[in-house]
């Protein structure tokens, strides 16, 4: 056994600097780009599936962005870090079965984000979003101008009639067979793409399915007064959630008619919303901010269009109900601040109680990425702490009329309160 090599590899693992984390389309896997290559994990239970080290030959190795294509052997890679594997203005579609590049696209500016489906490659630049066909060579279908989008914000809905893929380690499909084998794909199904508009606070909605590209229609949602900081589509592409750089309000709009369906309050203080995800059944929205607080909102169709809880009608008394302020239901002779009429999450947790931030800047400014496992379990991957966590929504009976400790009214007598409990956690360094 080469002892020096083993020690070196172990030291490299402990010092691993993560550059990017992304869940795949069904959130059953997630990929990690780092200074030496990339890793792919099964989400729950967490288990390492693929480990690629590009640092062996001494050449460039850093991967600053990675996107999986379901569970196939194709991944989108962009170089970065101290010693990049590829230039940051170059997108590589990596065939992990053959361990080589399958497609390459180069641009005049850095690639900030990449979204994949079996028929589309979406490339996000600072002021543009480009739509390509997933073919060899890739054919460009459309270019959309955006406001300065330094965080590469964009999201693509998941068409699950088109999501059947091979295991990452066993797939033998080529690019041509991947695209041509569309027996289960319905070209009339929407494949919604959301990204910032040309003006502050706007979101553009485009259908990038074959039928949608023929129509080439763009819907504009005026979502916020401030610049968009985070956005997310539900699986079916019918809802888009967004937060501005202020971070106090979460709004959910219809992508079909741009109507505002829900308006939720995250908090009173400014915060950066770092991640948002809808649950698999589109009934819940999880939101994580730089304050390390995880909120979950009910966006079930049973809710009213305004998102208010007081008008909720349901025959299931254990169904999660978003909270409202006690003063919001009282009639006052004069108008009261909008804050007291806000709708709040039905459960939340400050994750700092499980892992205090400490004094290290890397952990204080840590970024968590959200994924769902089922409809009641939320996975958070912390980039700097390199921690995987599983939080579960659990029910707790409330004997009283409401919880008045924080001034929020959960619901009526006999209904249920909900809480987020950390069920498990693991350190990514210990999984190699």
Swiss-Prot record:
User: What does the UniProt entry say about where the protein is found?
Assistant: Vacuole membrane; Cytoplasmic vesicle membrane
GO biological-process terms attached to the record: piecemeal microautophagy of the nucleus; protein transport
A Pfam short name: PROPPIN
Instruction: State the SMART domains in the record.
Output: WD40
Q: Where are the WD repeats?
A: 223-263, 268-307
Q: Which UniProt keywords apply?
A: Cytoplasmic vesicle, Membrane, Protein transport, Repeat, Transport, Vacuole, WD repeat
Q: Which GO terms describe its cellular component?
A: cytoplasmic vesicle membrane; endosome; fungal-type vacuole; vacuolar membrane
Q: Could you confirm whether the keyword Glycosyltransferase appears in this record?
A: no
UniProt GO molecular function: phosphatidylinositol-3,5-bisphosphate binding; phosphatidylinositol-3-phosphate binding; phosphatidylinositol-4-phosphate binding; phosphatidylinositol-5-phosphate binding
- UniProt KW Protein transport keyword: yes
Supply the InterPro entries for this chain: PROPPIN, WD40/YVTN_repeat-like_dom_sf, WD40_repeat_dom_sf, WD40_rpt
Highest taxon of source: Eukaryota
> How would you describe this protein's topology in the membrane?
Peripheral membrane protein
> What protein family is recorded?
Belongs to the WD repeat PROPPIN family.
What does the domain comment read?
Answer: May contain a beta-propeller domain involved in specific binding to phosphatidylinositol 3,5-bisphosphate (PIP2), leading to the association of the protein to the membrane.
As for what it does, the entry says:
Involved in mitochondrial or peroxisomal functions and amino acid signaling pathways.
Database matches in PANTHER family: WD-REPEAT PROTEIN INTERACTING WITH PHOSPHOINOSIDES WIPI -RELATED
The name this protein goes by in its record: SVP1-like protein 2
The lineage, from the top, is:
Eukaryota, Fungi, Dikarya, Ascomycota, Saccharomycotina
Gene designation: HSV2
């Amino acid at each position: 056994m080469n002892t020096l090599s083993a020690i070196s590899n172990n030291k490299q693992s402990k010092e691993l600097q993560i550059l990017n984390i992304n869940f795949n389309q069904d959130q059953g896997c997630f990929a990690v780009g780092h200074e030496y290559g990339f890793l792919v994990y099964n989400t729950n239970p967490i288990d390492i599936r693929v480990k690629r080290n590009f640092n062996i030959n001494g050449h460039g190795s850093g991967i600053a962005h990675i996107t999986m294509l379901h569970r196939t052997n194709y991944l989108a890679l962009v170089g970065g870090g101290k010693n990049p594997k590829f230039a940051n203005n170059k997108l590589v579609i990596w065939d992990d079965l053959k361990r080589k590049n399958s497609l390459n696209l180069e641009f005049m500016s850095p690639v900030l984000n990449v979204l994949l489906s079996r028929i589309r490659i979406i490339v996000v630049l600072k002021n543009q979003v480009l739509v390509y066909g997933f073919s060899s060579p890739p054919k460009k279908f459309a270019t959309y101008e955006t406001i300065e989008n330094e965080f590469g914000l964009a999201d693509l809905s998941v068409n699950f009639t088109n999501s059947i893929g091979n295991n990452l380690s066993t797939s033998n499909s080529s690019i041509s067979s991947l695209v041509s084998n569309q027996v289960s794909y319905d070209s009339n199904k929407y494949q919604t793409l959301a990204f910032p508009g040309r003006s502050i606070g706007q979101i553009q909605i485009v259908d990038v399915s074959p039928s949608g590209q023929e129509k080439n229609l763009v819907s504009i949602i005026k979502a916020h007064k401030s610049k968009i900081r985070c956005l997310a589509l539900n699986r079916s592409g019918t809802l888009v959630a967004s937060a501005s750089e202020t971070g106090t309000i979460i709004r959910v709009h219809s992508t079909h008619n741009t109507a505002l369906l829900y308006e939720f309050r995250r908090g009173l203080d400014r915060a950066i919303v770092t991640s948002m995800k809808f649950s698999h059944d589109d009934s819940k929205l999880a939101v994580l901010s730089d304050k390390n607080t995880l909120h979950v909102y009910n966006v079930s169709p049973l809710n009213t269009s305004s998102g208010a809880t007081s008008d909720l009608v349901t025959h299931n008394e254990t169904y999660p109900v978003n909270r409202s302020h006690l003063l919001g239901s009282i009639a006052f002779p004069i108008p009261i601040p909008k804050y007291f009429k806000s709708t709040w999450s039905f459960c939340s947790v400050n994750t700092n109680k499980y892992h205090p931030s400490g004094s290290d800047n890397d952990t204080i400014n840590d970024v968590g990425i959200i994924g769902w496992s089922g409809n009641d379990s939320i996975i958070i991957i912390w980039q700097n702490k390199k921690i995987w966590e599983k939080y579960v929504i659990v029910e707790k009976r409330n004997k009283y009329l409401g919880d008045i400790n924080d001034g929020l009214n959960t619901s009526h007598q006999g209904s249920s309160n909900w809480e987020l409990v950390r069920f498990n956690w693991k350190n990514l360094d210990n999984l190699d």
